[in-house]
Amino acid sequence: MMSEPEALSLSAQAALGAVQAPQRSQFSLLVRHFLERFFNHETASPDGDAKSRLILIAVATGIPGFMVALYLFPVYHPFIGWPPGRPLNADPPPYWLQVNHHFFFVLYSFVALGIITVFEWDLFFPDLLDVFVLTTLPIQDRRLFLARVAAIGIFIVGFLLDANLLAPLVIPASFDPPNLTRLLTGHLLAVLAAGLFSAAFILALQGVLLSALGEALFRRISLLLQGLSITVLVMVLLLFPVLSGAVPAFLQSGSRIVFYCPPFWFLGIYQRVLEGPAALPIYSRLAQTGCVALAVTIAIAMLSYPIAYLRRVRQLVVGPGTHDTRSWVARPAHGLLHATLLRDPVRRAVFHFISQTLLRVQRYRIYLVLYGGVGLSVVVASVLRLSVEQGQVRVEISADGVRAAIAIVAFWTIAGLRMAFVSPGNRQGSWAFGIVHGRPPQLDTAMHLLQAAKHWVLLCSGLVMLAAMTALWVFAPPELRGWRAAACMLLIAGGLCLLLTDFFFINVKTVAFTGEPAREQPNLALTVLKYFTFFPIVIWIPVASEHWVQAGIRHFLIALGAIAAAHLALEMLHRRIIQEHCNMPGLEDDEDDFPMKLGLRY
């Protein structure tokens, strides 16, 4: 039986001397510093506690591939009752179904590494902290540059392995291939190459544009590029169930589409290694294209990065030029708002405070871009349908997809705005509201402060919804182009914007951008579960109600009355919540409320 280590007395511990920290070189310390910046920055975690959150994300990155490989076991090994209609002694799944299974793993690696690289977009190049702090230290510029390059490489390779090394643990048992060595070799080569190409392409794109356009012009299009990248990546993944039905037609016909879609290149590597010389000729061509594209992309990233690095440092030293943020186009709109929604001075001040903060702080715009990219990709995946007829792939527009797109646009627009508004880390303006109105303020003042944010969200979501409906109307099927259908869709869209704004902001008790960091780490799994539970319900509403509302004017008026009643009920509930908040004793900036609440929630 092993004995526990003997406890040393204080004198014995003192005799051991101080604990010696490991000796690390300057280069090693710099690499660790840059990696720490990747895991702790204001975009990922405004409260400065991103390490635990990103560790959860890193673990979750490998779960989808692992779970899909696990769920494929009964497909290749049928048992009683599953899959339905297949006997126990059935042959392996059809060839093209197996190809689609391989294609998913390639596609997932491509999308996962692309999203991670886009999310860390701004951290790959120096910022003001690096220029005005690190460059003043006795550190060679070359060593500083190489340390950042090494940190980028470690970051990308780490996530590349994390996203793809769990699935191979299950694949041999799930697929039960005739040649295990070929399967694992082809799988690892294809998924690693796909992920590496995606990350290298994003880095090369950023390096080339920054080198060619300079920092000032690149900053103007940076958010647009991030949004488009997120949209394309998420859309490709969401379209996989639709795209999988067209994969055989694309590959058998030798369509040129597959040569313009990078995931197909690495599917070619997968199938060529797995099948050997017996593989279809198109796989060899796709594999060659993938290998050449990967080498060229990495070379471009390596050549453009030093130039972009130098241009970024030079621009940071020189400083950005000033520009006028006033908009002459917005003046008439502001006058109309001041005469209608923003008559109260407090509400008007908070409304413009929100507008100016969004223009000034890039972090909040990044949140909106990420949410907008995800929402747009879900809209496209919902609207598009691919069908194969006589070996030809046809693209169709789904009427139910157009109806669901209304709810998708409203949900992701308002959810993104709420995420930005309640995000902590930019509380410089909170002191002014506390001094002028008190902390907490009077009920009427508090309602004016909070209603301004809801008006801003409602106005923004309404404009986005109007633009989305106009674009959808152009491509909508004939059944959705009549005036009755348009009126019903406008009613449902307006009602969703109004009620979702009420629902998302019902527990918001602080002025936008002035909230405090949460004292407890939020449960990421519970947050995701809330979205997965609430989001399908929101999508179901326009799909299920549009035909009923369109049936007659009586149904239209009933729907209008139901929306108004729900809005009034949510407004009353919100006012009651704010009244309870205003009745609480005021706290100083860093004072804890534990002695008064004993940590209880109510």
Report each predicted region and the residues it spans:
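Membrane-cytosol interface motif
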Residues: 139-143, 322-330, 438-439
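Transmembrane alpha-helical segments and their membrane-interface loop/helix boundaries
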Residues: 1-114, 159-417, 462-602
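Transmembrane helix boundary and interhelical loop/hinge segments in multi-pass membrane proteins
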Residues: 116-137, 417-436
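Active-site proximal loops enriched in glycine and acidic residues that flank catalytic Cys/His/Asp
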Residues: 355, 434-436, 448
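Selective transmembrane-helix segments that form parts of the transport pathway or gating/packing helices
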Residues: 141-170, 440-472
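Intracellular alpha-helical coupling/juxtamembrane segments of multi-pass membrane proteins
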Residues: 24, 41, 127, 137, ...
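Short helix-loop-helix connector
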Residues: 137-139, 209, 213, 436
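Anion-coordinating catalytic cores for phosphoryl-, nucleotidyl-, and glycosidic chemistry
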Residues: 154, 209, 430
